[in-house]
Amino acid sequence: MGWARQPGLRTVQGVLEDALGKVLREPIQLTVAGRTDAGVHAEGQVAHFDTAAEFDGPQLVHRLARFLPKDVRVKRADVVPPDFDARFSAIRRHYVYRLTTAPYGAEPLAARSVVPCKSAVDVDAMRRASGLLLGLHDFAAFCRRREGATTVRELQRFDWERQGDLLLAHVSADAFCWSMVRSLVGAVLAVGEGRRSPEWVAGLLRETQRSSSVTVAPAHGLSLVAVDYPADDELAARNVQTREMRSAPAVEGCCGE
């Protein structure tokens, strides 16, 4: 299920707001750091809500566990400064994409979060291609266009880690536009499988619109693992800076960004 509440559909936002409403006995509206599409996971999602109610964080976490479904958990709850905004205060979002090169595919217990790929991928070539994408660029070729939204982003980390048969892509940026992370992974995986060159990936940065040659990697391999925030006394300034950078109601996150 995806994040955003939708009439008649089961979503993460919907089940969380309903559970919070039952515990706090008031309507709750969440603002989230990264809205994820259906199939994308989140291990380090951050959301905030406004309330006049007083509560103990650990006790709220314990009580929510009684109302939430097994596939949604709240791991921590804190009272934050008034200037904190889960979306606009964020300075960096971290994602991991999980692939397996095992000849038999993903382990059964990991099948919902690991995507099979070819066994003989050239990880060194993938690392070279990923390095060419780092920095402040227009990632239009990797993003699904949203009217009025910028596709300029600062890609701060994009590297690959081997753990046996597991191949992990670590991707971090100030923010991501819609489908960007999965498109980055799909493009670089094409290099690893010998279908494209690192230079082809770098050339995509010259495109001004979504490239039909870029394959979007499957949703279930992707997970939001962490969100970074500034010190409390820098929150207000960060909110203003982020709002000025976003010229339209673009959605921040990984795949529904």
Swiss-Prot record:
So where does substrate get bound? Y95
GO terms (molecular function) for this protein are:
RNA binding; tRNA pseudouridine(38-40) synthase activity
- Keyword Isomerase assigned to the entry: answer is yes
- InterPro entries with a match to the protein in the record: PsdUridine_synth_cat_dom_sf, PsdUridine_synth_TruA, PsdUridine_synth_TruA_a/b_dom, PsdUridine_synth_TruA_C, TruA/RsuA/RluB/E/F_N
Tell me which EC number(s) this protein carries. 5.4.99.12
* Chain coiled-coil ranges: none
Reaction catalysed by this enzyme: uridine(38/39/40) in tRNA = pseudouridine(38/39/40) in tRNA
Q: Where on the tree of life does the source sit, at the highest rank?
A: Bacteria
Enumerate the active-site residues: D37 (nucleophile)
From the UniProt record, give one GO term of the biological process aspect.
tRNA pseudouridine synthesis
The EC class name is isomerase
Q: Which SUPFAM superfamilies match?
A: Pseudouridine synthase (SSF55120)
Which Gene3D superfamilies does this entry report, sorted A to Z? Answer: Pseudouridine synthase I, catalytic domain, C-terminal subdomain, Pseudouridine synthase I, catalytic domain, N-terminal subdomain
Q: Which UniProt keywords apply?
A: Isomerase, tRNA processing
Give the family per the record.
Belongs to the tRNA pseudouridine synthase TruA family.
Under the subunit heading, UniProt states: Homodimer.
Q: What does this protein do?
A: Formation of pseudouridine at positions 38, 39 and 40 in the anticodon stem and loop of transfer RNAs.
**HAMAP family, alphabetically?**
TruA
Entry protein name: tRNA pseudouridine synthase A
Q: What species is this protein from? A: Nocardia farcinica (strain IFM 10152)
Give the lineage.
Bacteria, Bacillati, Actinomycetota, Actinomycetes, Mycobacteriales
